[in-house]
Curated annotation (Swiss-Prot):
It is an enzyme of class 5 (isomerase). This is 1-(5-phosphoribosyl)-5-[(5-phosphoribosylamino)methylideneamino] imidazole-4-carboxamide isomerase. It comes from Pelotomaculum thermopropionicum (strain DSM 13744 / JCM 10971 / SI). InterPro entries: Aldolase_TIM (IPR013785), His_biosynth (IPR006062), HisA_bact_arch (IPR006063), Isoase_HisA-like (IPR044524), Isoase_HisA-like_bact (IPR023016), RibuloseP-bd_barrel (IPR011060). The keyword Isomerase applies.
Amino acid sequence: MLIIPAIDLREGNCVRLVEGRLDRETVYSGDPVAVAGMWQSQGARMLHVVDLDGAFSGAPKNLDVIGEILSAVSIPVQVGGGIRSMEAVERLLELGAARVILGTAAILKPQLVAEACARYGEAVLVGIDGRNGRVAIEGWGVTVDKGTVELALEMKRLGIKRAVFTDIRRDGTLRGPNLEAIREFAAATGLKVIASGGVSNAEDLRALKKLEPLGVEAVIMGKALYAGTVKMSEALAIASGEEAEEGACCKKESSPAWT
């Protein structure tokens, strides 16, 4: 299982929101590029970058910062937020993104998903964000009358192989992931699943690790890493199935600049 640190961008800063609410924002760093480098230095093998301004406005807004991140790290980066045109897909891939995530477009522009999949294959993911089992779009401000599994199966028919599945009620809350919803989503869709939302401690990661046989191949971590409730070294050890014996020493990590 892959651990993917999240870098959420708003007005050029690295931030975290609670349940996607702008009025519950914490700014962790004014230098997202340095944050990306820090996660890479601590062993991350992929990063998850979200353009929050893009998600709320409908078009990418932090391309300069995203480009700097892509140039600064040597590990793959998946990017989402406001990608609702083929031009945006192409621009991000040209900048060096390994994957692009289509969220709102999955509902409003399914033809874009089909075209992007046909052209770029598994470099195209869908982000399916659920609130009480229903799909939320446009920066999570609008909930539509479609179930998360229903949408995932539609996207699978269009060629999608992998989905980022987020439980909005858990995102940024440190309340633990919605394991039942993740299990149901993975089992019902047969997609490769990247779970997101709510991870708060090592036990949460161990529980997600057990869902690997269902197709849960990765977990996006945000607030737990930024708040220090889980260390990167611990997360990586659990994800790889190589947790150290009790009392064993682990590699020392540099403390995040915001602590």
